[in-house]
Amino acid sequence: KNIERLGQIMAYEISRKLPYLRKSVETPLGTARASVLETDPILITVMRAGLPYFQGFLDFFDRSDCGFIGAHRKEGGKEVVIELEYLATPSISNRQIILIDPMLASGKSFVRSVNALFKHGTPSHLYIASLVAAPEGIKFIEENLSVAHSIWTCALDDKLNDQFYIVPGLGDAGDLCYGQKL
């Protein structure tokens, strides 16, 4: 539940940067002016690890369209290899996108996922939301994404180790939430 709560808090923080418009709202006692989102952002998460964090965002942006990415890290060797196996999303053209993944380690899975998404359109802005990030991952994203974007994280940890894990990090987010993979 704590990861969901962090998703709700991060969603609120990001919502403060989204475009709003003023609108008349009817109440039982009259009419009031209120600020409402111009359009709800599209929420996209990397499955399995991202699902609890994503749920917090969905609790906050409860009218948002949703997308899902199936990506995983291939173990072994000196390089990080990201396998992208699944992509399902509504049209992202000219929309605000929040890409939700709890761990921003090397940044390669974020960039690979974004490049796959951009084959289907270009968003007006991309918000990258993580729980824990490594400086190397933030640097990689800044050097390799050309679309308007911002990075949001709950914690910036020290570094990546030789196996490209965040140190001190929190371990495998998917395993922590759901148990070890087979």
Per-range role (PLM):
Residues 1-182:
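PRPP-associated nucleotide enzymes
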